[in-house]
Amino acid sequence: MRNINLLKIYSFLFLIIFPQLSISQNIKEIKKSIIASVENQKNDMIKTSDLIWEAAETSLQEFKSSAYLIDYARKNGFVVKTGVADIETAFTASYGSGRPIIGILGEFDANAGISQKRQPTREARVPGGAGHGCGHNLFGTASLAAAVAIKEQI
């Protein structure tokens, strides 16, 4: 499952970055660089995703989850603005200036009432608690990993 998700990230990044790069660059080198970036982030991505899974915070209450992602963004050289749109847990992570301007959305909120242990059979981690049935623990983490990989290419 994680390898399939990494392949999707690689493909997405290749399509986003390639048009922004000089035609003279070798496509194979670009692809290798993107794959290397995501692979280098793999352990951090899994750890962050797992932390967000365990926190399982519902919309507008994702204080721990937001902090995990903000910390990762800052460690990777992004300037972070918090409290975006007067939402305490919303943030933007920016890098560089000028063009291109690339925006990537990430969500990391959980849904109420769908707590789930990390296993293939139904068993609540916290009975009646929140959980990540929609995979937002992965979505937020993968979006930030994509932003880091793009940053490394531009």
What are these regions (language model features)?
Residues 1-26:
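Bacterial Sec-dependent N-terminal signal peptides
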Residues 25-132, 141-144, 148-154:
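Acidic/His- and Gly-rich active-site-bordering loop/insert found
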